[in-house]
Amino acid sequence: ITEVTLKVLPKQKSCTTVVVYTEKKKLVNELFEKISSSSSDVSGAVFIPEEPKDEEYQYNKERVFKFNDLVSNKSFLAFRVEGDKVSINEKIKKLNQELELDKLSTTILDVHQSIPFWKKINSLELFNQTNNNLLRIVVPPSSSIKLIQNIENKFKYYIDWCGSLFWVEIPSTKNDKIKEIKKITQEIGGYLTIIKKSEEFDFEETIFTVN
């Protein structure tokens, strides 16, 4: 009698990122809401707009997010789906219906592009070399559209946590704008933290929170 031992290996985990190209902030907000309420377990969702036309910022978005299947000179929303290949395909198929992706301009980042893409997001590589102020703002997802409307095209920023976390860069010559953003953040029930200060920063407050 010959004994045969069979080993059942777990399915290999992978990840895929779906990129949606849009400049419409209302659509971005709607997509974030649908992604948050989806049962497809999206593990990350960000919106990265075009950089403002202002010489006080470093234009590095295209370099930082240079991937074969990503059009980095456009505004885009990206979300990540994880699991084995079969479950990823099933989740994306369901999300395609929920988000009506067929009506939008999209591309797909495979696992070899997804992993470095999200590393760049998590390490804030877009702001790595800045000498400006860097703000971390957390707001209720339902109120994020109000903050978007107030900062769009004025500052370099991107949105993480499916709409509730904003990273905003404020030029050192516009320190007074921090107070304006603080006021807006308070009004919508959020809080603001200054992660990095410019050399010209002259406010006494460094951390703003709402009780």
Give the residues covered by each predicted segment.
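Conserved glycine-rich FAD pyrophosphate-binding loop
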Residues: 102-211
